[in-house]
Structures are given as C-alpha cells and as structure tokens.
Design a protein with these regions (language model features):
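A cross-domain feature marking catalytic cores of carbohydrate-active enzymes
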Residues: 34-36, 61-63, 85-87, 124-127, ...
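Hydrophobic core of alpha-helical transmembrane segments in multi-pass integral membrane proteins
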Residues: 1-6
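Catalytic grooves of carbohydrate-active enzymes
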Residues: 168-216
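His/Asp/Glu-enriched short active-site or ligand-binding loop at hydrolase and phosphoryl-transfer sites
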Residues: 129, 134-170, 208-217
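Active-site beta->alpha N-cap acidic-glycine motif
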Residues: 8-96, 100, 104-107, 111, ...
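Alpha-helical scaffolding segments of alpha/beta enzyme cores, especially the outer helices
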Residues: 45-48, 71-78, 103, 107-114, ...
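Glycine-enriched alpha-helix->loop->beta-strand junction motifs that scaffold or abut catalytic
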Residues: 53, 79-83, 139-148, 173
Length: 217
C-alpha cells in the first residue's frame, strides 16, 4: 500500500507536462498571480495597489475563504482580474484520494463561482502538488492547471526587498509570478503589500507589460 500510494502521488508529476507554467517568450508580457485568498484585510489592499498601478492579474482563491468573504471575491472579478480555483481547503492533493480530490476541486470551483458570479477560469494545485485523480475533473470544467515560473516568496519568508530582487532576476517574457495575499506563510500578506509596488516597477523596468492571465496564455 505505501508503494502504491507513492506511485499515485509522485506519478502525477508526469502529467504536469500538460499544465501551463509560463506564457510565450516571444512577447514581452508577464502576469502577477495571487494565491491563498481572499483575505479580508490584505486582499483589498492588494487590489488598491493594483488599481493604482493599472495592473490586472489573477487570484487563485480557496473555496471556503471565498464563501466566507464573497464581497472581496466580487470586487476581484468586478475590477477585471481573472479568478482561479485553489481548491476548497488548500489540502495537499498528495494526501487526497480520488473522493477527497473530487471534493477539493469541485467544491472549490462551485464556491468560487457562486461568490464571483462567474466560474473560475483556471486551477492551481496547492504547493504545486497534483495527483492522478485531479486532471480528469478539470477537463469538463474547462479550467486548465496553471503553475508559475517565478515565486518571489515560497515556503520561507522573504522580505519585500528580497522579493523585488528575485522578480527582477528571474522574470522575463512570459513570466507567471506567484505571490500570496493570505498568510499561508506567516506574515506573507504584509510582506506582499510592501513588495508589490517594487515588483511592478521592476518588471516594467525590464520592458514587460503586465496583463491578465487570459491575455498571457
């Protein structure tokens, strides 16, 4: 059983070849994406900053948080950002069998659709951890799995200046930048609001135009 479970989890990475990691390198475009929200305090501040800088991005929302804060979700959609499904509860899909995976994907999708008034366009697995049961659920929903090419802050805290420097160093045409507007990592939201203006300036300083995910892919 342990070996079978390991194959179920690890074997799914063969299927991530069908997922989207970046846009075309032929166009000077990039997209900012935000995971783990909505957060009732941080997400509105992020939306304010994006509006101030004239940027639209993509928010990968946790279903149960979307159900708790539907007003924030409606604002995300109303301001022209793409809405994505980040599962119902942010469980690692490596720890989910087929039935639990179905709940995470479909319940998340439905909760976000109800809060946003429109279905999610994309899906992103928590921590990038997929499984074999996930992909057959995404096709009928028409939600491709989208990961990222640049992650300024991953599982370890990174101060705003570090995040800006990583973006400047690693991003290029087609970049999908993965940011976090809720505290999956403690304090992530506060660090993001400090880093976001510098990230926008750094990417634009490289000649990149920041566009919604739907215009990048």
């Amino acid at each position: 059983v342990p070996l079978a479970w390991a194959g179920y989890a690890w074997g799914s990475h063969l299927l991530t070849l069908g997922s989207l990691w970046r846009g075309s390198r032929a166009r000077p475009l990039a997209t900012l994406t935000f995971d783990d929200g909505p957060d009732p305090e941080t997400t509105p501040r992020v939306l304010d900053a994006l509006a101030e800088h004239g940027v639209r991005g993509a928010f990968f929302l946790i279903g149960r948080r979307a159900a708790a804060y539907p007003g924030v979700v409606r604002r995300i959609a109303a301001e022209g950002h793409d809405v994505g499904n980040h599962t119902w509860s942010h469980r690692s899909l490596w720890l989910c069998g087929p039935r639990a995976t179905r709940r995470e994907v479909l319940d998340g999708h439905d909760a976000i659709a109800q809060a946003a008034g429109q279905p999610p366009r994309y899906f992103r697995a928590p921590w990038g951890m997929t499984n074999l049961a996930m992909f057959p659920l995404l096709g009928p929903l028409a939600t491709p799995c989208v990961f990222w090419s640049v992650q300024p802050e991953g599982r370890r805290p990174a101060e705003p200046a570090q995040q800006v420097a990583r973006c400047a160093r690693r991003a290029g045409p087609g970049a999908i930048v993965d940011l976090h507007d809720a505290d999956g990592v403690p304090g992530a939201g506060a660090r993001l609001t400090g880093a976001l203006p510098g990230i926008v300036d750094a990417l634009r300083g490289q000649g990149l135009t920041l566009v919604p995910l739907r215009d990048l892919l």
